[in-house]
C-alpha cells in the first residue's frame, strides 16, 4: 500500500513539474508577444525585419509576417498545419492564404492576398475600390468583410480577432494593440 501511495505521489509530482514548465514556457511566449507589441513605433529594435528584406510577392509577405512572429510557429518556422490556400479568384486576387494563429490566448485568423496590379479584373477593381473607400468589401450575398490594403494596394489583409469589438474597441487591450501593429507593418510591405 505504501508503494502504491508513493507511486501516485511520484506521478503527481512529475505532472506538477511538467505542467509548471509548460506554464513558464507559455508565460515566456506571452511576455515576448507583449514586449513585441510594446516595441512598435520609434522604440522598435534595429533588428526588426524590414519589408525591403523580403521578396515583393505573397511568399515574401508571409516570410515577413513569420519573422515578425504574427503567424503560428513550430520549431522556429511557419507551422504549415495552420495554413489554408484560399480561392483568391473570389475577390479577384492572384493568390491568397489563410492562417490560424493566436495572440493573448485568443484565436486569430489572418488572410493575405496578392493582386496582379497590371492585370486587375472587374472583381479585383471592385474589391480594391470598396476597401479603399469603406475599409470593407462584400462578395456574393455574404456579410461585408473588414479588410486592409497595403500602401501600394498590391496586397489585401483580412484580420479577424473575435475578442475585439469593432463597434467599441478597447484601445488599451493587448489584442487591439497587436492588431494595429500587424496592420501598420502590413501596410508598409
Walk through the language-model features, giving the residues of each:
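Positively charged n-region of N-terminal signal peptides that target proteins for export
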Residues: 1-9
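A short, solvent-exposed beta-edge/loop patch
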Residues: 135-189
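C-terminal motif of bacterial Sec signal peptides marking the signal peptidase cleavage site
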Residues: 16-20
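N-terminal "mature-domain start" segment
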Residues: 22-95, 169-189
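A short acidic-to-branched-hydrophobic micro-motif
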Residues: 101-122
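Second-shell loop/turn segments in exported
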Residues: 46-52, 109-115, 159-173
Amino acid at each position: 500500500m505504501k508503494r502504491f501511495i508513493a507511486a501516485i505521489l511520484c506521478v503527481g509530482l512529475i505532472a506538477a513539474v511538467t505542467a509548471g514548465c509548460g506554464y513558464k514556457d507559455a508565460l515566456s511566449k506571452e511576455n515576448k508577444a507583449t514586449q513585441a507589441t510594446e516595441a512598435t513605433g520609434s522604440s522598435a529594435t534595429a533588428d526588426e525585419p524590414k519589408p525591403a528584406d523580403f521578396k515583393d510577392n505573397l511568399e515574401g509577405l508571409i516570410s515577413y509576417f513569420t519573422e515578425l512572429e504574427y503567424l503560428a510557429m513550430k520549431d522556429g518556422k511557419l507551422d504549415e498545419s495552420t495554413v489554408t490556400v484560399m480561392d483568391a479568384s473570389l475577390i479577384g486576387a492572384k493568390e491568397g492564404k489563410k492562417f490560424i494563429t493566436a495572440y493573448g490566448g485568443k484565436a486569430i485568423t489572418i488572410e493575405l492576398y496578392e493582386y496582379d496590379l497590371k492585370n486587375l479584373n472587374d472583381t479585383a477593381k471592385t474589391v480594391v475600390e470598396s476597401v479603399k473607400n469603406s475599409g470593407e468589401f462584400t462578395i456574393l450575398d455574404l456579410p461585408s468583410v473588414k479588410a486592409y490594403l497595403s500602401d501600394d494596394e498590391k496586397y489585401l489583409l483580412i484580420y479577424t480577432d473575435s475578442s475585439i469589438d469593432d463597434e467599441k474597441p478597447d484601445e488599451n487591450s493587448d489584442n487591439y494593440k497587436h492588431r494595429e501593429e500587424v496592420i501598420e507593418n502590413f501596410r508598409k510591405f
